[in-house]
């Protein structure tokens, strides 16, 4: 790394030293380990979605075609690394604990990545403070315990660990750094496609410009052209690797590009006028880090080496504001209506951490223990509020029992027909995970190809009423074509939908979960058959999908362990201690 590092002697006080990385990892274990053992993320918004994907890989590793949603869709539309590791661990731990374990790995990798990323700009001590801060970030707790965005957190952690190797390669032409950086970036891409397409650019550009500024530092003797040419080599190799590792993903995107009406999302709101969404998507994720914004702006603009990082942070900060400013829509174009913007707030928080670590260093140097206690209190409050926030800002109803629904679908040949759930929320994915029958609905919007779902601008049919006229029109269209899809059974957890079902010819037959769920059926429906929507992956694509993405993560681990980092060793020359006793003078002999 290029930032100066202070080698401390034996007499430096504890508050004057960098926090060892081992201690930071133990702190992450202490803070998040108990929450994960309590399985708090199980109630997060997308947790059941990721378990659904993982359950399919656990049973059909080399066949990414999943018939359970949308009358059949290809899981090559979502990078598989997270789900494949969950699938492997699920054979020993079950799906719930497998999810917790992979999330814990992501949480442990994040402070390591933040430390290494921050060391590009700040000292070892400031970087260690930044790494500690990453454990308590409100945006991390928001994604883990409310949003359930496990792929996003793992992809960001892997990317942050890989970019310092890109920095070393660009400045020093170190081939070890090239190999390790490429492997980690490919593993990050195999975890989450949005992090690859948008996050990698936002995180990497400050690193590139800093490498140009630092081309002569620490005995390096590179030219601007040399740094840029090596960066181009890295980019070309990365694109080639992505083309191979994620080939089925690009092929699926080519055959079925996303062409559907935009689906509303609260993160695209104006946070100044919609105060509730501003709290949820900005204030809670940023927490006490908002107090550091003046320092970030002043220090980031005043020092030349920090400006690339600051400009990257500033752009990501603005993007994280969603529809509050027109800039995201101008920059992203049609992607604006596809993306959700809580991920940009997470990335912006990560990019701010090196400067926040620098602020912590300044405060501790000046105020000592008082500053340390104050910073620890603010960090703890930030995380505590973010973890507790879903209790006060509920994103879905309390969980209810769906075991009887699953049992019905799995017996007496009921899985020959398709089904639909209404009012099930995130438990739609739980039913899909364990039921053998196929549904016309599903939670992964980008995989939808049924025209009734793509043309109305609403998300899941199970939540139709929350999308107003568009949602109800989509539901009516599906009910109208029930014969075409073999849709015979509808499970209702919200009486709001019952008049529509009765009018459309369905009849109430049974109730489950002490009357909270009712089963509606329609006579005369023929068994379901395959539809023409979607392109089934070939056997070769299945083999590539089942080996290359997870292989990239294994390769990254092996390269990091086998190719040691080339570190410049420094040695402290300590002055002898001063002896205050009077010297004994003797005559020379």
Where would I find each of the regions flagged by the language model?
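Short loop/helix-cap segments at secondary-structure boundaries that form the rim of catalytic
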Residues: 430-434, 499-504
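Hydrophobic C-terminal alpha-helix "anchor/cap" residues
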Residues: 408-409, 501
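Membrane-embedded transmembrane-helix bundle of lipid-linked glycan/lipid transferases
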Residues: 2-408, 430-433, 456, 481, ...
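Short secondary-structure boundary/hinge segments and terminal tails
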Residues: 449-450, 500, 519
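Positions that flank functional sites
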Residues: 447, 497, 516
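Short, polar loop motifs at secondary-structure junctions
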Residues: 423-427, 493-498
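Extracytoplasmic/lumenal acceptor-recognition loop(s) of multi-pass membrane glycoenzymes
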Residues: 185, 379-392, 411-484, 526
């Amino acid at each position: 790394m290029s930032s100066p590092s202070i080698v401390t002697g034996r007499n430096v006080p504890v508050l004057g030293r960098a926090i060892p990385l081992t201690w930071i990892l133990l702190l992450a274990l202490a803070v998040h380990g108990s929450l994960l053992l309590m399985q708090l993320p199980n109630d997060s918004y997308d947790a059941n979605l990721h378990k659904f994907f993982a359950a399919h890989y656990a049973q059909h590793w080399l066949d990414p075609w999943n018939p359970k949603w949308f009358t059949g869709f290809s899981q090559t539309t979502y990078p598989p690394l997270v789900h494949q590791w969950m699938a492997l661990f699920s054979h020993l731990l079950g799906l719930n604990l497998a999810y917790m374990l992979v999330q814990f790995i992501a949480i442990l990798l994040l402070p390591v990545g933040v430390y290494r990323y921050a060391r590009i700009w700040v000292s070892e001590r400031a970087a260690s403070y930044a790494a500690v801060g990453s454990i308590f970030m409100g945006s991390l707790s928001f994604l883990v315990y409310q949003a359930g965005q496990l792929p996003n957190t793992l992809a960001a952690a892997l990317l942050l660990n890989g970019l310092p190797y890109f920095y070393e390669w660009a400045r020093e032409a170190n081939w070890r750094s090239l190999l390790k950086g490429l492997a980690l970036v490919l593993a990050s891409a195999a975890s989450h496609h949005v992090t690859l397409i948008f996050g990698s650019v936002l995180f990497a550009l400050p690193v590139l410009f800093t490498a140009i500024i630092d081309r002569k530092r620490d005995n390096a003797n590179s030219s601007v052209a040399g740094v840029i040419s090596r960066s181009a080599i890295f980019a070309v190799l990365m694109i080639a690797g992505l083309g191979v590792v994620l080939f089925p993903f690009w092929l699926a995107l080519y055959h079925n590009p996303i062409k559907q009406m935009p689906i509303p999302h609260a993160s695209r709101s104006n946070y100044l006028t919609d105060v509730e969404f501003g709290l949820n998507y900005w204030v809670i994720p940023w927490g006490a880090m908002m107090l550091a914004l003046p320092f970030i702006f002043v220090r980031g603009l005043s020092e030349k080496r920090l400006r690339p990082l600051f400009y990257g942070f500033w752009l990501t900060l603005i993007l994280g504001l969603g529809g509050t400013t027109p800039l995201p829509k101008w920059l992203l174009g049609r992607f604006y209506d596809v993306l959700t913007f809580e991920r940009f707030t997470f990335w912006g928080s990560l990019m701010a951490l090196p400067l926040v670590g620098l602020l912590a260093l300044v405060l501790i140097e000046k105020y000592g223990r008082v500053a340390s206690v104050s910073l620890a209190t603010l960090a703890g409050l930030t995380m505590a509020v973010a973890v507790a926030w879903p209790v006060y800002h509920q994103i879905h109803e309390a969980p209810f029992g769906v075991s009887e629904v699953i049992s019905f679908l799995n017996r007496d040949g009921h899985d020959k027909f398709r089904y639909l759930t209404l009012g099930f929320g995130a438990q739609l994915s739980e039913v899909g995970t364990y039921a053998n029958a196929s549904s016309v609905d599903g939670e992964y919007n980008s995989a939808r190809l049924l025209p009734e779902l793509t043309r109305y601008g609403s998300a899941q049919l199970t939540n139709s009423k929350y999308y107003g006229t568009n949602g109800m029109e989509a539901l009516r269209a599906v009910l109208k074509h029930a014969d075409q899809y073999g849709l015979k059974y509808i499970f209702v957890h919200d009486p709001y939908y019952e008049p529509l079902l009765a009018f459309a010819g369905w009849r109430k037959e049974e109730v489950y979960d002490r009357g909270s769920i009712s089963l509606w059926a329609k006579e005369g429906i023929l068994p379901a058959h395959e539809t023409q929507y979607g392109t089934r992956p070939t056997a070769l694509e299945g083999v590539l999908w089942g080996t290359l993405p997870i292989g990239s993560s294994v390769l990254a681990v092996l390269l990091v362990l086998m190719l040691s980092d080339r570190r410049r060793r420094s040695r402290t020359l300590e002055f002898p201690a001063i002896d205050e006793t009077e010297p004994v003078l003797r005559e020379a002999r």
